[in-house]
Design a protein with these regions (language model features):
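Post-transcriptional modification and biogenesis factors for structured RNAs
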Residues: 1-241
C-alpha cells in the first residue's frame, strides 16, 4: 500500500537540508520524499545529505527527483503549502494543529509542500494547493530552516494521526520491590547516623522525607544496588578516618 503522506521539497539548494529532512520524516514514521528540481541532481549521494540523514539513508535513497510540482503531487488528493504569511488570493491559511484535527480523519492522500531555503514557495505553487500551513512563531523572527519546518510539520501530523506512545521507563527495567527499597533506606539511615548527619535522638522528619523521595523515584533494582554501594563506600571511608 502506498504511503498516504508525502513530503515535497521545491528546488532545495542545500544538500544537508535534504538529508536532514529525510531524517525528520523518518523519525515520525514517514518515508515518501519527493524533490522537485534540486540544485544538485545527485543530491541523494552528496556527502552532506548522507551525513545529516544519519540513519535515514534509506529514505534519502528512495527519494524521487521530478521536474514539476504537478509530477510531485501525482496521486495526492490534498496538498498543503507551507508559508510564513498568507497569500491574498491563495488557499486558506491554518496553523498545522488546527488543520490537522480534521484532515487526519478525511482519508486523503496528503502532501506537504515546502519552498526553497531562500524564498519559500512561489505564489503559483501555493495556488496549486488546497490549504496553506503557517507554523506559529515569534512575530519578529518566524523564519525556520527548511529541515526544521519539515520536522515540525511531520511531528504535528504524526500526533494528529495518533502519535507514538512514550515509554515511561527504560525498556526491560525491573522496579525494586518494597523490601529492597526499605533495605536501602535502612542502610542510608545507618550511614547518615555514622557520619553525624542524622541525630537518632532527634531525627525530625528526615527519614520519612527520604522515604517519599525514593517512592517518587520508582527505583529499579540496579538503582537500589547503586545507592547501597554509595552508602558502603561512605561507611568504609568514614571507618578509615
Amino acid at each position: 500500500m502506498p504511503d498516504p503522506t508525502r513530503f515535497v521539497l521545491l528546488q532545495p539548494s542545500h544538500a544537508g537540508n535534504v538529508g536532514a529532512a529525510a531524517r525528520a520524516i523518518k523519525v515520525m514514521g514517514f518515508g515518501d520524499l519527493v524533490l522537485v528540481q534540486p540544485r544538485d541532481a545527485d543530491v541523494q549521494l552528496h556527502r552532506d545529505a548522507l551525513a545529516l540523514a544519519s540513519g535515514a539513508a534509506d529514505v534519502l535513497e528512495r527519494a524521487r527527483v521530478v521536474a514539476t510540482l504537478a509530477e510531485a503531487l501525482d496521486g495526492i488528493s490534498w496538498a498543503c503549502a507551507t508559508a510564513m504569511t498568507p497569500r491574498d488570493f491563495g488557499p486558506p491559511t491554518f496553523a498545522p494543529r488546527d488543520h490537522f484535527a480534521s484532515l487526519a480523519t478525511s482519508g486523503h492522500a496528503v502532501a506537504f509542500v515546502f519552498g526553497t531555503e531562500r524564498f519559500g514557495m512561489a505564489n503559483d505553487d501555493v495556488y496549486r494547493c488546497h490549504a496553506c500551513l503557517s507554523i506559529p512563531a515569534e512575530a519578529d523572527y518566524g523564519s525556520l530552516n527548511l529541515a526544521q519546518a519539515v520536522q515540525v510539520i511531520a511531528y504535528e501530523w504524526r500526533q494528529a494521526l495518533g502519535g507514538y506512545a512514550v515509554a515511561p521507563r527504560t525498556a526491560n527495567a525491573t522496579l525494586a520491590d518494597g523490601t529492597a527499597v526499605q533495605g536501602a533506606l535502612d542502610h542510608w539511615q545507618r550511614t547518615l547516623e555514622h557520619i553525624g548527619f542524622l541525630d537518632p535522638a532527634a531525627p525530625k522528619k528526615l527519614m520519612p522525607r527520604l522515604n517519599q523521595l525514593l517512592n517518587r523515584a520508582q527505583l529499579t533494582q540496579e538503582e537500589v544496588h547503586i545507592l547501597r554501594g554509595i552508602a558502603r563506600m561512605v561507611d568504609g571511608r568514614r571507618g578509615r578516618d
